[in-house]
Structure formats: C-alpha cells, structure tokens
Amino acid sequence: MMSAGGTYISTASVEVPQALQDGEKFIRWDDDSGTGTPVTMRVDAKGFFLYWVDQNNELDILDIATIRDVRTGQYAKRPKDNKLRQIVTLGPQDTLEEKTVTVCHGSDFVNMTFVNFCCTRRDIAQLWTDGLIKLAYSLAQLNGSAIMFLQKAHTKLCLQVDKSGRIPVKNIIKLFAQNKEDRKRVEKALDVTGLPSGKVDSISVSKFQFEDFYNLYKYLTQRSEVERLFDSIVGNSKRKCMSIAQLVEFLNKTQRDPRLNEILYPYANPARAKELIQQYEPNKFNAQKGQLSLDGFLRYLMGDDNPIMAPSKLDLCDDMDQPMSHYFINSSHNTYLTGHQLTGKSSVEIYRQCLLAGCRCVELDFWNGRTEEPVIVHGYTFVPEIFAKDVLEAIAESAFKTSEYPVILSFENHCNPRQQAKIANYCREIFGDMLLDKPLDSHPLEPNMDLPPPAMLRRKIIIKNKKKHHHHHHHHHHKKPAQVGTPAANNKLTTANSVDAKAAQQVGLSASHEDGGVTRSTANGDVATGTGTGSAAGTAGHAPPLQQIRQSSKDSTGSSDSDSSSEDESLPNTTPNLPSGNEPPPEKAQKETEAGAEISALVNYVQPIHFSSFENAEKKNRCYEMSSFDEKQATTLLKERPIEFVNYNKHQLSRVYPAGTRFDSSNFMPQLFWNAGCQLVALNFQTLDLAMQLNLGIFEYNARSGYLLKPEFMRRSDRRLDPFAESTVDGIIAGTVSITVLSGQFLTDKRANTFVEVDMYGLPADTVRKKFRTKTVRDNGMNPLYDEEPFVFKKVVLPELASIRIAAYEEGGKLIGHRVLPVIGLCPGYRHVNLRSEVGQPIALASLFLCVVVKDYVPDDLSNFAEALANPIKYQSELEKRDIQLSVLTDEAEALGSADEDLSKSFVFVQVGGQKKELRPVESLATSPKHRPSISAAAAMSVDVTVDRTDGGRGEDSISIVAPSIQHQHSLDQSVSTSIRQVESSQFDVDLVLAEPLEKILDHKSVKEKRLEMEKKLESLRKKHDKEKIKIAGQKSSPLEGKKPKFAITNKLVKRLSNKSLNCLSPHSEPGVEIPACPLDLGDSSEESAAADAGEDLAGGSSSLDGRTQESRLRSACREYTSQYRELQEKYHEAIYSAAEKVLKTSQTGQTKQLKASLDKVTGEVMHQLQEARRNEVKNLATVHRDRDELIRMKREVASSVVERGVAERVRLKQTFDRRTDELQKQHDSVRNALAEHRSKARQILDKEAESRSCVSSNGFLVLFHGPHHHGCTGSGSSALSGNNLTLNLDAGAAGSHSAISPAKSHNSIAAAAEMKT
C-alpha cells in the first residue's frame, strides 16, 4: 500500500506481490453490456501485464504501462443498473464501492477506457488497487533496458496461448511484421533457430524460453554494427573474445562520463569487469576464463548496466529545500478542456490524468451555475460545463498519488459572492488538512521574504485567486476613470489578439436567438436560452452567455488580476451598475469578479497582480505576488528585457500561457520561457504536440515530482545570466555533445522507409533543430542501419538547461517514436534508447543504437575570430539579433509539432487557374511564418482562398484550397457553404494598400510651399545684394571726377540655365538626386584672393588701383552675400525635409488606418452574410422538420456550424490583414529609408557645392567656378560657359562701364545676368 505521506512512484526494482501473481476471483462488469462476467485476474511475475480469464478460458490482457489510474472506494465506478448491481455484489460485508476495483487505461490524457472488477472483500480490492498503480508508475519499468523490453514481448507471447496451452506461430510473426516480405523473414528466422515456422504451427511454452526468443531477435536484427565495434576492440584475436583489460579500457575510455568526479565515481577496475562478464557472458567456459564473447558483449550493451540516462536522474535528485521560485513547475492551461477551445468538451477526468502525470498547477475557470452550484466551463463557448465540486473532489483524490509536492490551483473566478463563498467552503471541506489556508510561521507574507520550499509544502494545495484588499475602497474611489486600475491604465502590456476576441464575440452574437436570448451549451449537451441580463458580478446571469470567446487566462495582463496588492496601486476592477435589462459590455463581461472575503482568505503565497514593471517588482520585493503573461507578451519581455526577466523569476513566480488564437489547443515551445526562468509554463495537456512531448520528457526526471530545480545562475541574486548569451558564461562550464545514430531495431512492423532526427533544445544559442537527420533507409522498419557521421553540438553554453530529442520518423513525416534526454545525466558510450509514444509510454521493441560523446567544451584556436566572421548576427542590433535567435523556438514550433502526425492530414490540393498544380501545406498559403497560429478549425472546413497577384499585367491567379469540410448532413451545408463561398470571394477580401512613393511625398503641397518660400527668400536676398553691388560698381574710385566711368561691361550674360542644363549637382555627385534649392554661392578664401590678386594685370596706375579697391569691396559684399545665402539654404534644407517627414508620417498612419478600416468593413460583411445564412436556414428547418426535438437539435447544429465557420473566416481575414500589414510596413520602411537617404545625399551635395564654388578675377574677369579645377581656367574678355563655370567680363576698358554680378536662382534654374548702361 502507499505509505502515509508517500506516493506510488518508485525507482526500485519491481516486485510483484505474490497474491497478484496467484490471482483472485472477480466479477468483471461494464455498463454498456449490462452483464457481469466471473473472471480470475492475475499479474505476471515481472509485472508487465494484467490479464484475466473467464469461465470459457477466454483471455483478456492489458499492458500495465498503459494504466493511468486504479481506484477503489468512493471514486470507483458503480453500476448504474440496479440489476447489474445485484449481480456483481459478492459477500455480505463492505459496500459495493469498497469491493470494486476500477482500472483506467488509455494512450493519452483524454480518451480513457474503464474496466471494472468486483471482489468479495474490501482488503482484496485495496491490495490490487495499490499493487497495480505502483506497477503502472514504476520508473524502473518505464526506463527499462532493451533486454527488459524483449522479456516483456516474450512474456506477452507466453500469455497469449491457445486453448491447448501452446503459442501460435502466427502470434510471433504478427509481433514482428505485417508486410508479406517481412513475414517471410520471420518465418525463415524461426526455421533457422530451430522453431516451428508454419502459419498454423504452434510452440510449447516450455520449448520457447527467453533464450529461444533472444536467438530469434539476434537473427532478425543481425547487429552487424555491434560486431564491427566488437572487432575494433578485440583486434585480431583468434578466439574473438574480449579480455578483462580490454573491457576495462572500453568502460573507462568509451562508456565513462569524463565530467564525473573521480572520487565519487571511480574508474572501472578488473573486479568490475569480472562482475559484468559473470553477469552477461552466456558461455560458462568463457566466463570462468574472464573473457567476453560477442554474444555477451551484445547482452551487456542491451542490459540494465548500460542505460542511456544516469539512474540518479530518475530518482529525487534535486534539492527540494530551495524557495518555490527556484523551480520549473509542471503546469496545465485550460485543464478542464479535452479538445478544441470553442467546440470541445470539458472533463472532470482530465484533472485526475494531469495530476497523475506530474502536473502541479491546474486551472479552474469558475462561473455561476444555474442551480446555485458553481460550475467550471470555458466562458462564452459551446464547451459544456462541469460541476466545480466534482472537480475539487477529483483533485483531492488524485493530487498526491504520484507526487507529494504542492499543487497550485489557478482559479479564474467569475462567480458572484454567494457562489464564491460556496467554492471556498468546498475547498475547506474537501481538501481538509491538505489546504494551505494560511502562511507558514517561518515564511510570513512580508517583503524581502522568500517563498517556502516545496519540501515544507508536501501534500499541500495552494490557492491562486485574486486577493481582496479592503483599503482600496476607501482611498481611490473618487479618482478619475483614467486612474482606475484598468489594464490600459495599470499595465504596459496589452491583452493580445483583441481582434480575435472581438471576432469570436460577434460570431457568438450572430448565433444568438432573434429575441435577444443567448444559446449556451449545458453539461449534457443541450442548449439553454437566457436573456443574459445581469451585472459583471453575474448575480442574474448564472452561466456565461455565448457573447465572446475567452481568449485565455487573464491572470494579470488582461483583466482578471485587477486587484493590486498595495495602496500604491489601483482599485479592483469593477463594472458600473447597468440599467435593468442591459448586458454588460462584451469587454467587461469576460472579466473576473471581485474576490469574496471567504475565498480571499484562502490565498497566501500565490497572489496574482497586474505586472507593471521589473523595477516596481524589485522595489516592492514581494515574493508572494506573481503575474501571468500570454506567450506574445512574455516573448516581448524576453526580447526587450531578458536579464531583468531572469532576475524577476529568481524571486517571484510567473505564469506563461498559450495565446488566445490557439483555438485548436496547440502549444508554444515551453523551452522559450524556461530560458527566462519562468516557473509556470502552462500547456494544453490534451494536445500531445511537440511542445507537450518535450514537457513530458523533461518532467519525467526528478522522480516525476513536477518540480525541477533551475540552473544555479537562474537562482542566485549575485549572478547574472543573459538568455541570449552566445559565448561561454563565466562560472558555467560549456559542454560538447556528439551523437552518432548507428541503427534501429523494430521501429515499426510495417515495411516503411525510416529516418532519425536529432535536435537540441536549450538557450537560443544551444538550440539546434532540423539540422541533423540521417539518411532514409528504405523498406526496412525491422533493423535499419544508418551508420551516420556524428552529429556534433560543438558548444552547449548552458548544459543544465539543454536537452536532446531523438525521434524516428517514417518517410512521410509520421512520428514513430521519440525520446527526450537532458544533457546533464546523458551517459556517453554505445547505448540503446527505447522510444516513447507522444504521451511518453514505451513503444514495444522500438529502440535506437547510438554512440554518444559528452565532454567539456574546449574552444579551438582563433575560434572567436572565425565565429565573428561566420556569424554576422553579432553585428546586428540586439532586438533583431534576439528575434533571429528566438526563431528556432518560435517560427517552426507549430510546423514541427504537426510533423509528428501524419503529414498527409496537413496537406491540401492547390489549384491555380483551374489546374491542379501541386500538394502544399495549408499554412504556406494562409499565413506568414512569423505569425503562424495553429488553427485546426480552419483546416476542418471547406475554404476557398483567392489570392490576387499583380504580375506584369498577366492578370490574377485564383488559388483554391480544398480542405476536409465539416460533416453536417442537412441543408445547412448548401446554404451556408454558398454563403461562405461568397464571403471568401475577392470582393470580400481585405483591401490591398500600397505605400505612397517618395516622389509623391516630395511633391506634396506643404513641401512645395516650403520650397517656394525658400526660393522667394533667396530671390529677395539676391536682389538686395545686386543693388549693393551696382552701388559699389558705380562709386567713383578715381580722382578724375566728372568723367564718365571707364568701366564698361564688354559682355552681357542673360542666359538662364534650366534645371536640365545646370542643376545644383557637383561633378562628383550621384545622378538623379535633386535638392530643393541651392544658390550659386560665391565662395571666398585667402588662397583664392591671393591667386586672384597675383593674376590680375590691370592697365594704368590709377585705374589699376581703382580696380583693385573696387574689386575688394565687391569681394567683401560677395562674402556677406554668400554667408547669408548659405544660412537660408541650411534653414530651409531642414524645414523642407521636416515637412516631408511630417507628410510621410501622416500618409503612413492614414494607410494603416485604412487597412484596419478595410478589415472591419469586410468583417462586418462576413458576419452579415453568415447571419443571413443562419436565418434562412432556420426558416427552412422550420418548414422541413415537424418534430420539435429534431428541430431543436438541427438549430443547435446550425448555430454551432455558423460559429465555427465564422471563426474560421475571422482567422482567415485576420491572417490576410496581418500579412498585408507586414507588407505595408515593409513598404513604409523602404520609403522612410529612401527619404533619409535622399536627405543625406542632398546634404552631401550642398557641402560639396559650398566647397567647390569660388569667385576670382582673372585677366579682368570675375570668374564664378562650380568645380574644383578653376585654377586652370582663363578668360578672354568675353562671356563664356564652360562646364559649371560662369565667366563675367570685368575688364576696365575705355568704355568705363561699371561691372556687376547677379547670380540668381528661380524655379530650379540658375540665372546669371550682368548689365550696366553708361
């Protein structure tokens, strides 16, 4: 029996009680047949099978490994039929329940089969109950060697005898093969090993000992790879036997873990080698001489002394006296569900199954029951309800059968105060001493105080529910609405997938009755109708109306944990009183109600609050407060604040649950959040996808306690761990793992093509997926030889958090079996790995033969340099880098999970232009890899998707996806299907919005206005300086007053240069870039002035002096002009591009809103179409079906079908919206980058032009240069245009005219004019 305070889990060798071997008389019964059958029930000597024989000698056999639970007494099944109860009642003593043994078995957590047996006495029933469940949860049996599983197969053959007590040969053939060719192989092997091989032959049990079966196994598998290994060890020995010295060397160099301490784990010595030879060598002569033959060597490799995992890892190996926040805790999400989030079923049984599997945190979603009995139901869906009391009783009965460590009940409470009080009373009555209703004296609820350790909370149930804080009502009730503790005000994280929630809400409303009543599934599947009135507390609305789909547990980030735990936070979330007859707003309807005093009194160490910030949590340091995040919010925190997230989880609990879009109850990869130290990573246990397989594999260790101690760097406050670390962390010894897949044995009884994949999960730097895969061995599931090169995981940064998953697949992608093995505890050397099913049960004889090498990581010379060259990710921004790192755990999670199933189910025919092109997965057309929700509902319907593609004017391709449709055998199919096809046509698709190009942005009115304003200012400045220069040129500089000026312009340049002939680009600037405006600046430098002065040779002394004086004044005016011109240019350069950026931002924001408006519009049209289809169908049904019950049933089907189809359409439109949003965002980014590049180039051009322009005089001319080669330019007394240079005549001739320069720019052209009249 289970000892007090103990569990049925054990790592000890199996000992089957003699009473179970001898057998006992029972009456087997089931309610379906209504009959009771006397049987004799037994267990074989090795504890593999439970079997019973009836009076006709008919045998039934049950694999004990598939047994999930065994019950007697209060929780055993009881016959419903009175007559059957009388038949099965034996003996006058004890009640029927106390004499009943109910055996529960199944291949997953949902589909359970119950077998019931009644005996004569209570003690007999108790003995069998305890004995069977202890065998079922024996870790020694679960992790047995390859030899043990051979013994199990042999035992089954020996039990399945015919009426004459002999073993039919056909049973042996059937065990190994189904295919005709493989059956011939088995028949030949039987013949060669001296056994009967005919199909109708049989074998005496006494002549079919285990040795005979083992010889048959050897012949079928050949094991040539083991023979090669053996030869490499013994060399050219004539006897082909391994000596003691050779065995010692093999044990120490190949089979020993080099990471182990030599004192605690000493090397093998000759004495140890002799023990192994004595144990495994079948030839006594060899054993006496200390020699090991090939047969003995194979037996050792398959034996108990050569496990793949260190036996200590299976036992309770972790320190259980650390604070609870230092452990990963096996957690379940939406525990009550057994399938789909919208249309699945609820179950009391699955609570038992999750707890028995080691789950230590389950979720209960309470709602008001119609009969004043609180119920558990998935709010606002078609999922039927179950009574809360039944669930609490199931938890009390199963919580500590397989683990004695504390269980957390995560309440999501929507009940009114009266029913909340009833729940609290049930908890006290049903749980009794197991309920932790007050904190421990050693760990008070105070800041800076750690949580108690699991060891102190053995066999305790902890309630997680909102905590009532009375002082909030007195201090904050006068605050403005914006200050009230709503998610928008208090929480920086928003509830994910509001679009999907709104979608589901509208679908639900569309399925409601015309008169305002709302349909709701009840426990027995009927649909109840109600007005749905009442406040948020639910005082009138007893059960949740079908208004909207609850997206997920809103523990903190949504609305459920709106109570804060201190005065510095805000009010509990309450709903204002509503006018009579009005329903609360949908977004309020799903919120949790305020915690009642009775249930609040039960809450202590797990108090959910809104998450505000890591800084706030660190400042308060209340370890008893915890927050919950959906997977998207947690991923955001992980990417943006990884180190802070890890530090937060050192002291406080955090719960991460699947996003609300996972209607099919799929899971995210839990490794993603284990990397951040999140303790309660909650998964949908009903879905055995890749994520759940990994979860089950990891929590199998530490005695399946449900608690795994986190690595030291995730616990110590004085240590820092970055989950995105790529290099070795100081203080952590990195590891290297190498795995060679050599062969497989009996992977499948089909003649299949098989391959093996080896993946590693851990930190992003350690995670390797879909990289290592063996070749495909064709037509051989019996003994495939892979003999691959080693799969090397060169550097494992954090081995304590890393695990290996080895999986065998059929060529089509169907999972054969897998195994999850933590790197810490992995045994090196040549090892057999027995494969498991998705739920973690052993698969008959299926095993892989591996060569494993584990060692500490030693970097190669210059490895860091080589890594930097080969890994450009290091030079990206941190967020981009983390996105890429996380992709190995997020992008492919759902795709890989579906690969474990038959891939043919995930593929559909794709038609392009009316022709069948190829077979392609649905997701590849439905969504982008980055946002790929796993929606099986969408795949369960007939969906036509039209994809518009602009392709050089070649028109559009219509892509039709044909998936399995929901099977409804009434006219709804036709009407709604027609409606769906209309809804899904292109006219109801989300509009395609294209980003405005840069040219349109720069051509916008506000940008043009700025450009025109600049041109006017520059023109005004030019005119001002023209006047100044004319004034200077007209002043008398010579003592010869009264004479005509001697300066006369000899050439007049009035040619205006258009933008095409002369723009502001320098000779070295890039073509095609125009800046808004740039004047012809007249640069000046001392060198240029000196060169000009040296080069001038003006005729006459007085006139020469006058010319120089006048030129210096002109040059001074030119400098002032150039300076002011440049200032204006700088000012408007910024103004023009700021205006362009504003236009761009406004345009892009408007386009995003336009896309969202398009989604809302088309969604409304979709809902309208569905509602119209439903109304029409209901009218049609009323005319066709006269039977009232049939009519009600058909209406239910209509409502259910519309909801499912509506959700699928919502999902499709949302996916299209997300895809087009992503595309639009990329276009926006491209335009923003183009504008920035345009701005930068314009700046470069301005700077180059400023440097290259100059104003010098040469041979009587003032030359305005635009290029850097002006020193070689000469004038000849005439106007010239050479390249970008303007030459103006300034010669002081007899005409005596004054000179002036007039550079100007108007409307993107440069005009230079100089004119003076005498």
From Swiss-Prot:
GO terms for molecular function: calcium ion binding; phosphatidylinositol-4,5-bisphosphate phospholipase C activity. Residues 599-715 form the PI-PLC Y-box domain. Residues 318-466 form the PI-PLC X-box domain. It catalyses: a 1,2-diacyl-sn-glycero-3-phospho-(1D-myo-inositol-4,5-bisphosphate) + H2O = 1D-myo-inositol 1,4,5-trisphosphate + a 1,2-diacyl-sn-glycerol + H(+). It comes from the Eukaryota. It holds the Pfam family PH_14. Transmembrane segments: none annotated. GO terms for biological process: entrainment of circadian clock by photoperiod; flight behavior; G protein-coupled receptor signaling pathway; lipid catabolic process; neuron cellular homeostasis; phosphatidylinositol metabolic process; phosphatidylinositol-mediated signaling; positive regulation of canonical Wnt signaling pathway. Expressed in neuronal cell bodies of the optic lobe, central brain, and thoracic ganglia in adults, and the brain of larvae. Keywords: Hydrolase, Lipid degradation, Lipid metabolism, Transducer. PANTHER family: 1-PHOSPHATIDYLINOSITOL 4,5-BISPHOSPHATE PHOSPHODIESTERASE CLASSES I AND II, PHOSPHOINOSITIDE-SPECIFIC PHOSPHOLIPASE C FAMILY PROTEIN. The production of the second messenger molecules diacylglycerol (DAG) and inositol 1,4,5-trisphosphate (IP3) is mediated by activated phosphatidylinositol-specific phospholipase C enzymes. This is 1-phosphatidylinositol 4,5-bisphosphate phosphodiesterase classes I and II. The lineage of its organism: Eukaryota, Metazoa, Ecdysozoa, Arthropoda, Hexapoda.
